[in-house]
């Protein structure tokens, strides 16, 4: 796990949460769910990856309509990838193959 990359993704996600918390109460709830994990990521105290299911809040995108905010969803996805161990080889190859098709 890349601690610096994790910290940067936590900061970017927090920035998006602050923006969308001003317009959607569901974003406030997501921020509340994620705040302890974001704080640990920003201060460098997460030393090993967590399980995918342990990242709070995914259901808020699929069931609570936060997917309408693309920048927030992308920041959440990137943070989730980093906190769960970073981009896997399979994901990297998939992304590269998709870039080659565009």
Model-based region annotation:
Residues 54-102:
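Amphipathic alpha-helical binding modules
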Residues 1-2, 35-44:
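Phosphate-binding glycine-rich loops and adjacent basic patches that engage nucleotide phosphates
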Residues 1-33, 101:
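Short terminal alpha-helical segments
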Residues 7-10, 14, 31-38, 55-59, ...:
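Generic structural concept
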Residues 16-21, 41-48:
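Secondary-structure edge/capping motif, primarily at the C-terminal ends of alpha-helices
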Residues 25-30, 46-55:
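Short, well-ordered alpha-helical segments
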């Amino acid at each position: 796990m890349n601690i610096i990359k994790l910290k940067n993704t936590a900061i970017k996600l927090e920035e998006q949460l602050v923006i969308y918390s001003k317009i959607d109460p569901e974003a406030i709830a997501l921020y509340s769910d994620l705040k302890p994990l974001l704080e640990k990521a920003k201060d460098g105290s997460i030393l090993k990856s967590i399980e995918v299911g342990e990242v709070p809040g995914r259901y808020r995108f699929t069931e609570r309509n936060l997917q309408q905010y693309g920048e927030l969803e992308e920041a959440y996805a990137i943070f989730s990838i980093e906190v769960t161990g970073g981009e896997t080889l399979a994901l990297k190859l998939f992304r590269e193959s998709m870039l080659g098709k565009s």
